[in-house]
Amino acid sequence: DRRQRQMCIRDRNGFITEDGKSPGFDTVMNIYNTFYYSAAHPVASGNLVAFRQVKRVYPFEAAYRRTIISRLQELFAGKTEELRKACEVLGGTLLPQGDVGYVLPVFPFLNIAVLFWDKDEEFEAQANMLFDSEITEFMHEENVVCVAADAVYYLTLAAGMTPEKIYAQ
């Protein structure tokens, strides 16, 4: 069941829906902020980099690691098949890195990558996300963290787990 998520923005009132329902605060704000904060003519680089290499996100790195990455590691430790299935359901493209590694579409013009190494008898689970190096040309740097939080939400939902809402309730 690979599908690209499709959202609708009502021209009369600006409401955003997915299958007739609001997709949630973080998703809606990411979309609105992309309209508001994007550069005049943003272009994705296609070059996926670690969070700390994204322009102007440094002040948010500690919170990103503490909330997003640690939660992703906890949620999918011992559940690589569930994570793999979720990435495929979300339209991901397989990567050779990690026990599970996929490029996921955020918008039709912008991707992130999710990389995951499962726990074993010696090491805890490890995870990372990579972002287009020009993502802050599309949105405010604080929204990069929200994109990552949304990724965790949609991955847990697609995996058949309780959807993980890291920021917005």
PLM region descriptions:
Residues 12-74:
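Long amphipathic alpha-helical segments with strong coiled-coil/leucine-zipper propensity
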Residues 120, 128-134:
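Low-complexity, glycine/alanine/valine/leucine- and proline-rich hydrophobic stretches
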Residues 115-121:
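Short beta-strand micro-motifs enriched in acidic
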Residues 1, 106-110:
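A short, glycine/Asx- and small/polar-enriched loop/turn
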